[in-house]
């Protein structure tokens, strides 16, 4: 967000779950709304270590203060938990406009580097897709009389995966559930062994 010129306000983490603390978040939102002169505000909670950020409550605050909600789901694909009597799943964009994933080597799906932006609706994918291709849009489409014509409407970046990286990432999707299950087993063992430690 800093690269887009946004003023970034960090929020405390609740030590028990290790996720965003809603009380300091609301204080930050009040402060941000006072100083916000234009543009959209964004809340970006992190779902971490297989635990889902309090997305339902973050959605309530986002609506109350007129902010977008973008989940950083890099550490939580396939994660879910009960929040306020409902099952809340990471990466689904049920509560958020967007969710982001990382394909860094230590993540669940790795292909060297890169990432993905998941969108709640198909229309929300237009801007991230355009920004990943130098801000270029092709108004005529590939089947037009001028398929080569394009317009650079934003200052974007070259953030596309290579075909080799994409193939590597796709090949890991079939193993994702098994990998997450293995991590859950290991986390359970650690929790059990460390629960008796001071």
PLM regions: where:
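Hydrophobic packing residues within well-ordered alpha-helices of enzyme cores
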Residues: 1, 55-58, 128, 190
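Substrate-binding/gating loop at the entrance of the active-site cleft, primarily
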Residues: 1-23
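Conserved donor-binding loops in enzymes that form glycosidic bonds
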Residues: 12, 48, 173
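Active-site phosphate-binding strand-loop segment of PLP-dependent enzymes
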Residues: 16-111, 116-118, 122-124
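Active-site region of PLP-dependent enzymes
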Residues: 75-88, 95-198
């Amino acid at each position: 967000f800093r690269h887009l010129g946004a003023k970034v306000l960090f929020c405390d983490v609740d030590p028990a779950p290790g996720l965003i603390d809603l009380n300091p978040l609301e204080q930050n939102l009040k402060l941000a709304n006072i100083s916000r002169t234009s543009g959209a505000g964004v809340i970006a909670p992190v779902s971490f270590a297989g635990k889902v950020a309090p997305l339902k409550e973050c959605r309530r605050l986002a609506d109350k203060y007129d902010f977008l909600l973008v989940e950083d789901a890099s550490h939580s694909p396939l994660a879910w938990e009960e929040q306020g009597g409902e099952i809340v799943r990471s990466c689904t964009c049920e509560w958020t406009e967007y969710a982001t994933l990382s394909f860094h080597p230590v993540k669940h799906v790795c292909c060297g580097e890169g990432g993905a932006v998941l969108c709640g609706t198909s229309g929300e994918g237009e801007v991230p897709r355009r920004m990943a291709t130098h801000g270029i849009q092709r108004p005529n489409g590939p089947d037009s009389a001028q398929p080569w014509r394009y317009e650079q409407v934003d200052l974007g970046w070259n953030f596309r995966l290579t075909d080799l990286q994409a193939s590597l990432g796709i090949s890991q999707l079939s193993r994702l559930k098994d990998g997450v299950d293995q991590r859950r087993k290991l986390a359970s063992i650690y929790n059990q062994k460390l629960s008796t430690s001071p």
